Regions:
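TPR alpha-solenoid repeat register
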Residues: 46, 81, 115-118, 152
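Structural register within alpha-helical repeat arrays
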Residues: 49-54, 68, 85, 121-122, ...
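Residue-level recognition of tetratricopeptide repeat
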Residues: 43, 78, 112-115, 148-149
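TPR/TPR-like (Sel1-like) alpha-helical repeat modules
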Residues: 6, 143-144, 172-189
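Short coil/turn linking the two alpha-helices of tandem helical-hairpin repeats
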Residues: 57-59, 91, 110-113, 124-130, ...
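Single conserved hydrophobic/aromatic residue that forms the stacking wall/gate
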Residues: 1-12
Length: 190
């Protein structure tokens, strides 16, 4: 067992050196971890490690990241696993399921900065689904979790700007752009 564990230690050291070398990119990590994730889809320790590496390398839009998140969610439906599954659905254009998993992650998460990012991602999914009032609500949630968070203000500006003719009164419709400018100025200020 000691020989076997040392062998694994060497494997992990080599992987760490490869990742830190700067040679590793999302495509190579997809090729390396894709088969390993499939082979280890019930091994939560391996899946956590793979997810951490993929996040560290900013490969959280790769198929292997989505698969690992999906398998991890089946074993242990944590907030992080739910977020991975939510992003998978978001990328596929299934915004209703994306919102469902983002909501679940929001309910489980305790860190307000992460909650802010999840609420913002939910707002973006709702905007894509053309559910503008709900998207606005999630932008406000994101801002309540993290005061100096500019992205929700930018998304709010996009929401308001995407529907400038919300009334039959032309004068009021022109005011929409003042709201857009206000939100962009707030985003710049934070």
């Amino acid at each position: 067992d000691l020989v076997r564990s040392r062998g694994l230690g060497d494997v992990y050291k080599r992987q760490a050196m490869f990742i830190q070398s700067g040679v590793a990119d999302c495509e190579s990590l997809q090729n390396i971890y894709g088969p390993k994730v499939e082979a280890s889809k019930t091994d939560s320790a391996f899946l956590k490690k793979a997810l951490n590496i993929l996040k560290l390398m900013k490969c959280n839009e790769s198929e292997v990241y989505f698969k690992a998140s999906e398998y991890m969610y089946q074993i242990d439906p944590t907030a992080d696993a739910a977020v991975g599954v939510a992003y998978m659905y978001y990328k596929k254009g299934d915004y209703d399921n994306a919102v469902k998993y983002f909501d679940e992650a929001l309910a489980k998460e305790t860190d307000n900065d992460k909650k802010a990012e999840m609420a913002y991602a939910t707002a973006a999914a709702l905007m894509q689904a053309k559910k503008l009032s709900q998207a606005r609500s999630y932008c406000q949630k994101a801002m309540s979790f993290k005061e100096n968070y500019g992205e929700p203000y930018i998304l709010l500006a996009q929401l308001y700007g995407s529907n400038p003719n919300w009334t039959d009164e032309p004068a009021l419709n022109k005011c929409t752009y003042f709201v857009v400018i206000d939100k962009l100025q707030r985003a710049k200020a934070v």
